[in-house]
Design a protein with these regions (language model features):
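Conserved glycine-rich Rossmann-like NAD(P)H-binding loop of the short-chain dehydrogenase/reductase
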Residues: 37-52
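Active-site helix of classical SDR
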Residues: 129, 166, 174
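Substrate-binding pocket helix/loop in short-chain dehydrogenase/reductase
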Residues: 105-106, 110-118, 216, 220
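Active-site loop-to-helix junction immediately N-terminal to the catalytic Tyr of the SDR YXXXK motif
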Residues: 109, 156-164, 176, 204
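Residue(s) in the substrate-gating loop at a strand-loop-helix junction
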Residues: 149
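Conserved glycine-rich cofactor-binding loop
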Residues: 16, 23-24
Length: 228
């Protein structure tokens, strides 16, 4: 596939960003774009692969460090913020990307399935925002980007009750938090992407009717414009 060459214009020169769920998929795509635009990024995810991804970006001349973090744990999020402040001194951007999606029939599902989605998709965003926002408030500046889903805002498929519920919650969370943070010159925005070529989507694509026939380009978008 032909790859377009995109030119960086340094939109984020000197900015310090935390990206959760940064080891793969949309989070990794955001990390590539942010660092290409000059940001220094702290990549957070649960597994060691986030450390390897940080090494990959460093090898390409980007400013990136990895940190293992479980966003469902409030203390882990505080540790992430402490690490960022110790490493870079401040936080300008917070990208809340970490999330899970597993399919299950609502009537036969157990509470563990529901609670897992709530723990990562809702509490995870809540925890990392609670940990990072005090720094932005002190700075009287900042930007929070929350990755929800079209599933939580427009349309959902069978088996996605837990996922759709938690992603819809993020839309309401964003609206309310944006109003609270506006007096501190902090922007809070929510993005609701559709299907993207990520490991998460590929894992459950086989259990759904294909969506690509309904798309103008007959293919799923890539998580990073450099891959398009």
């Amino acid at each position: 596939m032909h790859q377009r060459e995109l030119v960086s214009i340094g939109k984020l020169d000197g900015k310090i960003a935390i990206i959760t769920g940064a080891s793969k998929g949309i989070g990794a795509g955001i990390a590539r774009v942010f660092t290409e635009e000059g940001a220094c990024v702290v990549l957070a995810a649960r597994g060691n692969d986030v450390l390897q991804f940080a090494d990959e970006l460093q090898a390409a001349g980007r400013e990136a460090v990895g940190f293992r973090c479980n966003v469902s744990d409030a203390q882990s999020c505080k540790n992430l913020v402490d690490f960022t402040l110790k490493t870079y001194g401040t936080i300008d951007i917070l990208d809340c990307n970490a999330g899970i999606c597993t399919l299950s029939d609502f009537l036969t599902s157990d509470d563990a399935w529901r609670d897992a989605h709530i723990g990562i998709n809702i509490k995870g965003v809540w925890n990392v925002c609670r940990a990072a926002l005090p720094t932005m408030v002190r700075n009287n500046a900042g930007s929070v980007v929350i990755i929800s889903s079209v599933t939580g805002d427009m349309v959902a498929d069978p088996g996605e009750v837990a996922y759709a519920t938690t992603k819809a919650a993020l839309v309401g969370f964003t609206k309310a938090l944006a109003r609270e943070m506006a007096p501190h010159s902090i922007r809070v925005n929510c993005i609701c992407p559709g299907d993207v070529q990520t490991p998460l989507v590929k894992a459950w694509q086989a259990n759904r009717a294909p969506t690509t026939p309904h798309m103008p380009f007959r293919r799923l978008p890539m998580p990073c414009p450099w891959d398009a």
